[in-house]
């Protein structure tokens, strides 16, 4: 399967430390060698970097590990292919426009017997993965349910998306990250965890490579940063492990739903 990584923060923050740990799982400490991608939000815009090769050997990944792109929301994914060939078009995260915002999505897991359920017309997949088709179906269902205008209150939208994720989970393993550039949603079938860092900040040590960071030297007392991952990335912090069917919604680093 694949691995997920995401971040929600109340100030523009770089994800160099966490991505350095994740990238090692793309061929060094893990078997996820079939591509990787990462999306950084900046206001209503975003920038996405992808590569169909292993993150541990990718020069583009080296850039992400060395150049601190600051963002309040980041979504990332390293791939171990099961549905769809190894190619750039099948590499997560996937992005679509809805209600004048870019929605970004990544999925870890594998689905079966899904083609009859995922009927879409407006949102079409470009590649041939179960993941991208599920994303298109979620957005199509949201538009059919809520209409063409973005609701003033987004809580019912994410509540509804959680019910859709429950349906998808009946078809297999569905761990999901989803963001509209404001909120970050995480849905768990079997492997997902998160940690929220706030003052007083301390040191953290990566599991997958010999890197230590002192967050007190990198942050201010007002910073709040939540990181979501398939498995804990550090060995000296208390990560919160989600249970099957759990979902969380974060805004500016804080838990707002779930």
Residue ranges and their predicted role:
Residues 1-59, 204, 245-247, 253-258:
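Extreme N-terminus nucleophile/cap motif
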Residues 2, 103-113:
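Conserved beta-strand-loop-short alpha-helix elements that form
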Residues 52-64, 78-100, 117-121:
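Short acidic (Asp/Glu) patches
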Residues 73, 149-190:
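Catalytic core of PPM/PP2C metal-dependent serine/threonine phosphatase domains
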Residues 111, 179, 245:
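Glycine-rich phosphate/ribose-binding loops and adjacent secondary-structure elements
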Residues 113, 120-145:
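Glycine-rich phosphate-binding loop plus the immediately following alpha-helix
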Residues 125-130, 190-213:
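Gly/Ser/Thr-rich active-site loops/lids in small-molecule metabolic enzymes
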Residues 203-246:
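A conserved acidic, glycine/proline-rich C-terminal tail/linker
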């Amino acid at each position: 399967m694949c691995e997920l990584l995401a971040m929600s923060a109340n100030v523009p923050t770089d994800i160099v430390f966490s991505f350095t740990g994740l990238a090692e799982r793309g061929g060094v400490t893990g078997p996820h060698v079939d591509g990787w991608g990462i999306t950084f939000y900046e206001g209503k815009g975003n920038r996405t970097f992808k590569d169909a090769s292993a993150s541990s050997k990718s020069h583009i990944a080296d850039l992400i590990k060395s150049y601190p792109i600051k963002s309040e929301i980041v979504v990332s994914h390293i791939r171990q292919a099961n549905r769809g060939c190894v190619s750039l078009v099948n590499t997560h995260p996937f992005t679509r426009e809805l209600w004048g915002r870019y929605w970004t999505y990544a999925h870890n897991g594998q689905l079966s017997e899904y083609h009859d359920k995922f009927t879409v017309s407006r949102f079409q997949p470009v590649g041939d993965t179960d993941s991208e088709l599920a994303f298109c179906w979620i957005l199509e269902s949201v538009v059919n349910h809520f209409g063409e205008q973005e609701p003033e209150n987004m809580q019912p939208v994410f509540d509804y998306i959680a019910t859709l994720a429950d349906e998808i989970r009946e078809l297999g393993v569905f761990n999901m990250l989803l963001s509209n550039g404001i909120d970050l949603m995480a849905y768990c079938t079997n492997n997902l965890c998160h940690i929220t860092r706030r003052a007083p900040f301390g040191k953290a040590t990566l599991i997958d490579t010999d890197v230590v960071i002192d967050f007190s030297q990198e942050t201010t007392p007002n910073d709040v940063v939540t990181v979501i991952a398939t498995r804990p990335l550090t060995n000296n912090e208390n990560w919160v492990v989600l249970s099957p069917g759990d979902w969380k919604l974060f805004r500016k680093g804080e838990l707002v739903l779930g």
